[in-house]
């Protein structure tokens, strides 16, 4: 009998089990192993005692928030692989010291494998740091991989750059490792348009990566209407003085000009001068 993890990995779920995507992101796309954003652009503010919502993606936004003192993180993504990739990476950080962690990540990038071989089975090594659901997913993945039913890049996309993360430095990695002992991430399978229906709290900080860039793909009426719906939905779960952070790889969208008239947000941005292309981080602060 095929279990739910095989159905997930083999993309056999029925339409009723799939999450409607408001953007072009899919339910079963390979999940980024690393961010492709310059995380150093984000402000280094103290996030202790803040309610935080992040996009899941590679897990790096949640990890960056934890590095800056955040401890209670809600994380959402329409991609149902993202939470498992994030959880595995976090388990490895908890298990391994700085050099051992990045040595294993080099194996991943060079061999396109999680190094499930005779030298070490990473999943068994980090099992105590995975919950039951996460362990069963990765155990099923390995079973299917050995039997040539799935491949590494069906689940994980090694595109990105670990050096763009603040925790790529030993001092920050060790701080993150300590902070993870008191941190909790709750994952939601949700698209951005539905997240306000799936959570039961309000947030001080929201980190959306480049999701809004996809929502506001052009300044045509259709996309502007979508953008206004998304921001209006997020506004319902934001506390006074909260901030939404986003990333823009094209530096063309008008995030402040297309705001609904009944909403009041202050817009700010910082460009990445060393990226070689136009990229920026922007913030929408609730006034």
Show the residue positions of the predicted features:
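S-adenosyl-L-methionine
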Residues: 1-48
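Class I S-adenosyl-L-methionine-dependent methyltransferase module
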Residues: 2-14, 25-26, 81-181
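A short acidic, Gly/Pro-enriched loop at the edge of an enzyme's catalytic core
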Residues: 49-50, 193-208
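Conserved class I S-adenosyl-L-methionine
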Residues: 49-58, 73-76
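Conserved SAM-binding loop of SAM-dependent methyltransferases across substrates and taxa
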Residues: 58-70
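Conserved beta-strand signature within the Rossmann-like core of class I S-adenosyl-L-methionine
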Residues: 207, 240-249
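A short glycine-rich, Lys/Arg-flanked "PGG" loop and its adjoining helix->strand segment in the class I
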Residues: 221-240
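Core SAM-dependent methyltransferase catalytic element
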Residues: 262-287
């Amino acid at each position: 009998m095929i279990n739910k993890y095989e159905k997930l990995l083999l993309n056999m779920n029925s339409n009723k089990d799939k999450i409607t995507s408001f953007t072009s992101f899919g339910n079963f796309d390979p999940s980024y192993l690393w961010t492709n954003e310059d995380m150093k652009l984000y402000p280094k503010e103290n996030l202790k005692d803040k309610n935080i919502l992040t996009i899941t993606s590679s897990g790096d936004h949640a990890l960056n928030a934890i590095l800056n003192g955040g401890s209670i993180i809600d994380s959402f993504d329409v991609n149902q692989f993202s939470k498992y990739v994030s959880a595995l990476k976090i388990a490895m950080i908890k298990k391994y010291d700085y050099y051992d962690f990045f040595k294993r990540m080099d194996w991943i990038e060079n061999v396109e494998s999680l190094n499930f071989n005779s030298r070490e089975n990473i999943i068994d090594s980090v099992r105590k740091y995975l919950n039951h659901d996460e362990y069963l997913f990765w155990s099923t993945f390995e079973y299917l991989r050995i039997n040539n039913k799935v491949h590494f890049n069906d689940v994980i996309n090694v595109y990105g750059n670990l050096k763009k993360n603040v925790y790529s430095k030993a001092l920050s990695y060790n701080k993150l490792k300590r902070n993870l002992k008191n941190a909790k991430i709750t994952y939601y399978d949700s698209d951005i348009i539905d997240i306000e229906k799936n959570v039961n709290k309000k947030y001080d900080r929201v980190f959306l990566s480049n999701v809004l860039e996809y929502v506001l793909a052009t300044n045509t009426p259709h996309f502007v209407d979508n953008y206004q719906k998304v921001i209006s939905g997020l506004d319902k779960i934001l506390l006074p003085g909260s901030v939404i952070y986003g990333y823009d790889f094209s530096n063309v969208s008008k995030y402040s000009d297309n705001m609904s008239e009944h909403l009041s947000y202050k817009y700010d941005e910082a460009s990445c001068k060393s990226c070689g292309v136009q990229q920026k981080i922007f913030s929408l602060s609730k006034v």
